[in-house]
């Protein structure tokens, strides 16, 4: 199977699209859109779907259970281009992130991000390998597209936006990792979404600057505070977990109420939030 990517530079101008990536897609590679439900994934999906044929697109999401913002999967489904399938990559054990944290007796941190490896990257790569094997029409070729941007952090600025994934390029697979919007600024991301006639996930309008776990180890103080206000029931669960394991979510080693200034939510708070 081969195809030709339309050379509409206006429509693809926000994307980083090296010649090698274009040629690989034209050879019929599957393009997997790693979708968190956040603004960057959404903008990436809009841009990539403008020039990659629909039958070569697949969206994949790693559900995070109770720590995920409500409505995330529905938001992804509502904003995907028609005809693009969505697969959900659950953890192999079925255990939630909070259960994994309690087992380990500690929260993840910047150097030990088992939240990413155990609940996102590992399950997603597993499901993509399965999908590729079940669909031989792609010839074992896959591009894993992710929405990381250089502006987000010094570490992400150093990421290579197109590279061969040697760890997954085996057993008849040829796998490349692609960061199509690596060079975009935050304003560009929201512009792309608005120009497509879409809105970002509701949590942004509610005051969050990022959409990850509701209480993320990398979140700013303001995001943690707003999350505590928006999800009092889950906030109470995190505080109780901190006390049980004797470890804090914040790298400052301050308990959440000291970080956010928000007292523990009463037991009558909505348990679904």
Task: Name every feature range the model reports, one short phrase each.
Residues 1-273:
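Nucleotide-activated chemistry modules centered on ATP-dependent adenylation/adenylyltransferase
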């Amino acid at each position: 199977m081969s195809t030709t990517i339309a050379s509409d530079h206006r429509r693809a101008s926000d994307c980083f699209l090296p010649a090698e990536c274009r040629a690989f897609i034209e050879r019929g590679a599957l393009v997997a859109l790693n979708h968190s439900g956040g603004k960057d994934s959404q903008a990436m999906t809009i841009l990539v779907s403008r020039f990659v044929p629909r039958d070569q697109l697949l969206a994949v999401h790693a559900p995070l259970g109770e720590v995920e913002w409500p409505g995330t999967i529905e938001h992804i489904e509502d904003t995907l281009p028609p005809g693009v399938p969505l697969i959900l990559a659950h953890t192999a054990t079925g255990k939630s992130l909070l259960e994994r944290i309690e087992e380990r007796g500690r929260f993840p941190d910047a150097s030990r991000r088992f939240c990413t490896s155990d609940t996102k990257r590992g399950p997603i790569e597993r499901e993509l390998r399965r999908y590729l094997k079940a669909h031989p029409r792609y010839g074992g070729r896959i591009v894993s597209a992710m929405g990381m941007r250089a502006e987000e952090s010094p570490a992400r600025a150093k990421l290579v936006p197109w590279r061969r994934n040697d760890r997954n390029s085996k057993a008849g697979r040829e796998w490349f990792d692609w960061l199509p919007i690596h060079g975009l600024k935050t304003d560009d991301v929201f512009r792309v979404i608005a120009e497509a006639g879409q809105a970002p996930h509701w949590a942004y309008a509610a005051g969050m600057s990022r959409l990850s776990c509701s209480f993320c180890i990398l979140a700013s103080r303001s995001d943690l505070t707003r999350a505590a206000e928006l999800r009092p029931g889950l906030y109470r669960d995190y505080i109780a977990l901190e006390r049980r394991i004797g470890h804090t979510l914040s790298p400052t080693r301050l308990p959440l109420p000291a970080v956010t200034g928000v007292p523990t939510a009463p037991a009558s708070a909505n348990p679904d939030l």
